[in-house]
Structure formats: structure tokens, C-alpha cells
Amino acid sequence: MDEGTGLQPGAGEQLEAPATAEAVQERCEPETLRSKSLPVLSSASCRPSLSPTSGDANPAFGCVDSSGHQELKQGPNPLAPSPSAPSTSAGLGDCNHRVDLSKTFSVSSALAMLQERRCLYVVLTDSRCFLVCMCFLTFIQALMVSGYLSSVITTIERRYSLKSSESGLLVSCFDIGNLVVVVFVSYFGGRGRRPLWLAVGGLLIAFGAALFALPHFISPPYQIQELNASAPNDGLCQGGNSTATLEPPACPKDSGGNNHWVYVALFICAQILIGMGSTPIYTLGPTYLDDNVKKENSSLYLAIMYVMGALGPAVGYLLGGLLIGFYVDPRNPVHLDQNDPRFIGNWWSGFLLCAIAMFLVIFPMFTFPKKLPPRHKKKKKKKFSVDAVSDDDVLKEKSNNSEQADKKVSSMGFGKDVRDLPRAAVRILSNMTFLFVSLSYTAESAIVTAFITFIPKFIESQFGIPASNASIYTGVIIVPSAGVGIVLGGYIIKKLKLGARESAKLAMICSGVSLLCFSTLFIVGCESINLGGINIPYTTGPSLTMPHRNLTGSCNVNCGCKIHEYEPVCGSDGITYFNPCLAGCVNSGNLSTGIRNYTECTCVQSRQVITPPTVGQRSQLRVVIVKTYLNENGYAVSGKCKRTCNTLIPFLVFLFIVTFITACAQPSAIIVTLRSVEDEERPFALGMQFVLLRTLAYIPTPIYFGAVIDTTCMLWQQECGVQGSCWEYNVTSFRFVYFGLAAGLKFVGFIFIFLAWYSIKYKEDGLQRRRQREFPLSTVSERVGHPDNARTRSCPAFSTQGEFHEETGLQKGIQCAAQTYPGPFPEAISSSADPGLEESPAALEPPS
């Protein structure tokens, strides 16, 4: 630098700044353990010295901003600063302090952000995190579809006047939506980013769940007409009005009867959306897990996912039983017992809860990549390269296997062209073993579908318990028994190492035993209640038969009763009446327990003791008249008459046994299905079985079971000319029809699994006979070594290891004897036997 230039740096001085910075960095190179573990401390510790030391006579001071430019430079011969200039040491201190703080904050914030992003990336690319999301997704879907909906279906029927066949249609729409998109999702989703497809499916499920709850918010509020103090005679018999007749129900424009099909359409659309959204869960989710984890961990991950799916229905039944114990409108609670048929439970809140939970679960699904990177263990650093190679090898092995499978499938005619699809379908369906086991599995699946859908309704109507308790009993009995049965069936197959033939025999035995156990369900039940005007007459005239059902009689024909609201009362004669008006009751009052008491009931004139009819008198009722004490007319209390039936516990025990034995056959059916086709045909065979199950079991079963159940109804809801839900069933007919149809399906399944077992046996026996014809046994040693020979079974040493093995069983036996008893005699036998034994394989060759 020229002396006349003062403090202005020249071109050569600007080049000295990087050298000074490098010198500062060289003095800061040594790192400590703390600086390595905490990079922020390392960057903050490397600072140039602000004061000259004794060892540095001509120090260079510099202030470098964030852009790397030098603000102040002092050469080896510094000039004295001007009086107006600030102190050099003070300026340098402020500059370095500001730069150090900015560097510290910027570096620390950047490192913290990078660390957070790295942690988030590691979490969202971990197969275990995907497994957790997949488990919750499967759990919520199974909870809502297989458990919660079945537990609240009877409540929805009463609220929106649905028949059992219509509610069965709602259940079937889930599988309809599933069947519509399964080919599209499986084909395009398998080649795309599968977690994204799962997330979109979760969105559809959430929207469908919210849509299912929409009728509660758009329908008129549910109202119950109760007697109050302002109108004490409302709903009672107006005996003074001789011209009063039965009044038809009023039909306002916004009534539920006029909008009946609107609500049904909303339910159907919601179920179809849920079915479409559920398709990727069981088609893309398992394949994504299997393709992105090690082969030895794949089965464990899939087992955890399916266990969560199995727990969903149980929790769904329990959740439904809990929620429908509350009134449907929390803002307007009523004081009604759950046994009152007018009580409607809170059915809609569970769908909103499932929708919210599904929204929370699917957000991480959007972030998972198309392919997860291999996961390595951090603790074992020495084996890092080995682990990486093993993971890559596993993934390469899976891809190679898939490519080889595609080549084999293409060579057999599968997957080449869409036009080959009919030929492939005919090839699969012409396999009698596969066809028989698929039809048997379809019949069993139809029974399971009928049980899951309508068993809460059966328990509620058969034993007269609230819908909430029926749902809880179903969740406690059905789901655990099915889970234990499936696990036991799989354990038996693994423990005994059963093949296709033995697995078919196990399934046949389980089907036969469960068919016999069905007989217990017919005899364990209750009798129908005596409902005045429906299954028992009002008066005791000369004829005690019921030629037709009529709610009116001589005792209530002039009361002007309304018949659109079912408000049962129990008369002192042990008969249940439709409402207090039809019982002929004139006065009412509240008891201390909250139960309403009705007096002066003209239809309850005498106490009738009903005895069971004798054989041949099923249509007649034997009535014993006993005069009522204290008053001429009878009295009644609100609610149905209690039934003396104590068979609920035995029924639940027998139901557990039947479900358990039926579930034991499911793993056997799957094994027979996989073993009955070639390895290359298995994916297409499972797809064909999927279509058979949906079209023959899952879709039609709820509809025709619901239609058959409707035939047992003895009291229908009538609202605005629309026949709504069933108020009372003939529970005896319900029991025989329901379990009779299920037993018929069980018998059909037994026949088909027997045919599947016989077809396997026929094929194996035919193959064995063909081998015997092609390779006849000509020598004594071969006959002794044959597995069917008695000597071979008693002495395994003589059995052969193969058809063309050089060392036969007889030769091994001679060598064993020579080693055990050494001497000239065994050696002579061995040497003389060798030439003959060497020729034995030639005898197995087919004759020319």
C-alpha cells in the first residue's frame, strides 16, 4: 500500500482479506468433543482475537460482514487514526460482536430447521410409521363398517321408517362400491404412489361417514307426544264421544314419511363412498408393506395390521352400544326408558367421530414416498454396509421374483391381453377343486354377513332387551369367538403341517360339527308377547281364534284413538296393548317410580291367564277368566309386559360355540384355495374368488335375509301411507326363519367342501395310479421300499429316498448291518448284493 493513500485500501490490499480469513480459520481448526457433538458451539468458538497478544507484534484486525467483505484493515505499518475517526478497538469490538451474534443465530436456526426436517423425513420414510398409520386406518374403517353400523341399524330403521330389506340394502351398498372400483384401484394404484391412493381412500371414507350422519341434521327434529299436565286426557279414550273413530295420522309437508327416499338415497351414497374408499386398504396397503420391508418382517407387519382390523368390529359394537344409550337429540332430552319403542338412540355421533378420526389419520399418508428407503440400525455401525446390502438384496429379490412371476404368467396366457381374460376365467372356473372350495367359502361368508348385520336385531327382539345391550353382547361374543377360532384353525394347520387334502378334511369336519350345533339355536329362545288385537283378541267371546289382525274392538271402537304412534302399555291381564287409548283407559296418573299408571281401562275387563295350546290347536287360545279384584275395569302401566324368559345366557354360550367352530374352518379354506391352483394363477384365482364372494355373499345376503325377516313382522309402522319399520316381530317365527336359512347355507357349504375334499382325493389317487403304471415296481427291494408297503412303514430304513436314487433302502440296510457287525459274512452279503442293487434303478424306467 502506498504511503500517500492513507486508510484507503488498494487492489493489492483487497486480496489480503481472504488470506487473513484463512489464517483465522487455521487457528480455529482444532475441534473438541463438544464442538463435534454441538456444531453451534463449534461455529461460535472460531473467532479472531480482538486484542493483540505479546507474541504477535503486528496483528491484523478485520471485520467481515456476512457477505465476506472486509470493513477495516490495518497493515504492518499502521497509520495513526484521525481525531475524527472512532477508536479502532471499539469499532472492531462492535463489528465482531454484531457479526458473531448474526452468525450464531443464523447458523443455529438453520441447523435446527435442518434437524427438524431430517427427523420428519426419517419418521415419514420409516416402515414402522407407515405400519402405525395403516393400523389406525384399518381399525377405523373396520370399526365403522363392520361394527358400529350393525349396532345402530335397528335405531336407524325406527328413526327413518326403514324395513329390514331396506336396511340390508344399505349394508350391501358398501360391497357394491367396493366391487365397482376394485379393478381400477388394483391396476392403476399398484403402479402409482400407493400411499397417496390410501390417503384418497381415507378421504372418501371420511366424507362418506359425514354424509351418513347428514340426515340427522336435515330431517325434522324427532318428537315424542307425551301426556302432560295441560292436556291430561290427550292420548286417552274419549268415552263420552260416541261418534269418535280411529284418526289417521296427520301428514305435514316436512314429515319424515314424504322424505323417506331422500334419506335412503343419502345412506346409499354414503355407503358407496365408504366402500370405494375402503378398496385401497386391503388391496394396496398389504402389498406396499410387503414390498418395502424385509421378507422375514413382512408376515409380522401384515399380522399386526389384520389384528387391528379384527379389533375394529368389536370396538364398533361397544361404541354403538354406548352411544345409542343416549337420546338422539342431546338438546332436548326426554325421560323415557330405553325399552320404550319410542326411544331413539344417538346413532349419528359415531359416524362424525369416525370421520374426524379418519381425517387425522390420513394426513401423514400424503407424505409417504412411492418406495420406502431401506432402514438401517444406527447402533451397529460396523455392519452398516452389510445391512444395506442385505436390504437391497431383499428388495432386488422381490423385484426379480415379481418379474419372473410376470414372465411365467405371460407364458401361461395370463396378462398378455384383455382378450385373454375370458379364457383365463374359464380355465380357473373349470378347476373343480377351486370352484367347490370357493362356493363353500361363499356360503360360509354369507352366514357371517347375516350374523354381523342382523344378530343385534335378533337379540333385541328375541329377548326384549335394549338395543344398546344387544350391541354390547354382540361385540363381546361374536368378534372374540371368531378371532380365537381363526387363530386356532391356523395353528392346527401349522402344527400338523396339513396339506390341501388334510386342510379340506379339517374344514369339512368343522362345517359338519357347526351344522349340528345349529340345532341348539332353534330351541333356545323366547315366546312372543301377547299383543291385544294382533295375536290375541280383545274380548272373550265364543270364538277364541284370530281370523285377522285388528287393533279395534268393541271396547275401544268409539275412543277416537290414534294408531300412528306405538306407545305400549301392560294391562293387569298380562296383555300388552298398542297404546292407552286402544286399551280403553280413561284416566292416568304418575307413580312415584316415574311409570305412568292408567285406570278405568275398558278393554282390560278381566284377568286372562294364557296357557300354551295343545298339539293340533295352534290357532286357538285357551283362556281362563278370573275376575279382577278391587275394580270392575282393569288398569295398565306404561311399557310392555315382561316376559318370563331366562334363556339369554344359554343362547350366548351356544352362539359363541357355533361362531368359534365356523371360524376354525376359514384358514383351511384359504389354504385349499391357494393349493388348488398353480403359483402363477394364484393372484387371478384370488381375484375371481373376491368377485364370487361379493356377488354371491356380501351383496345379496343382507337383502334377502332382511326380506325374510320382514315376513315375521306382526305389527308394522304406518306413517303417511308408507309402511315403515317393524314394531313387533313374532319372535318364534323370527328364530326359526333366521337360523333355518343360516342352517341351509351351512348345509350347502358342507356339501361343497365335501366335494372339494373328494376332488383333491380323486386327483391324488389318480396321479398315484398313473405313476404306478408308468413306473412299475419289479424288484423286491423296490416293493419293500414303497411307502405303502407294510414292511416299509414298520422299518423306515428300507424306504427309498427317491424314485431314481442310486442307493436303495435295501443297500442302506446292508451297509448299516456291516457297520454294526463287522466281519466276513456281512461283507460278502454286501458285495454280492451290490451288482443287483445297482441295476434296480433301471427297472424303474418305463418299458420301451
UniProtKB/Swiss-Prot annotation:
Which Pfam families is this protein grouped with?
Kazal_2 (PF07648), OATP (PF03137)
The cysteines joined by S-S bonds are 555-585, 561-581, 570-601
Report the Gene3D superfamilies cross-referenced here: 3.30.60.30, MFS general substrate transporter like domains
Q: Which residues are glycosylated?
A: 228, 241, 469, 550, 590, 597, 730
Q: Which UniProt keywords apply?
A: Cell membrane, Disulfide bond, Glycoprotein, Membrane, Transmembrane, Transmembrane helix, Transport
The question of whether Plastid is a record keyword is answered with no
Query: Does the keyword section mention Lipid metabolism?
Result: no
Annotated CDD domains: MFS_SLCO5_OATP5
A Gene Ontology biological process term = sodium-independent organic anion transport
What residue intervals traverse the membrane? 129-149, 169-189, 196-220, 261-290, 310-329, 345-369, 428-449, 470-493, 498-521, 652-674, 684-709, 743-760
Instruction: Give the Extracellular membrane side ranges.
Output: 150-168, 221-260, 330-344, 450-469, 522-651, 710-742
Q: Mind listing the GO molecular function terms for this protein?
A: sodium-independent organic anion transmembrane transporter activity
Topology within the bilayer: Multi-pass membrane protein
Annotated localization: Cell membrane
Positions with biased composition (Polar residues) = 40-56
Classify the main location.
Answer: membrane
Give the family, as the similarity comment puts it: Belongs to the organo anion transporter (TC 2.A.60) family.
Record-linked PANTHER family: ORGANIC ANION TRANSPORTER, SOLUTE CARRIER ORGANIC ANION TRANSPORTER FAMILY MEMBER 5A1
Designated name of the protein: Solute carrier organic anion transporter family member 5A1
Organism of origin is Homo sapiens (Human)
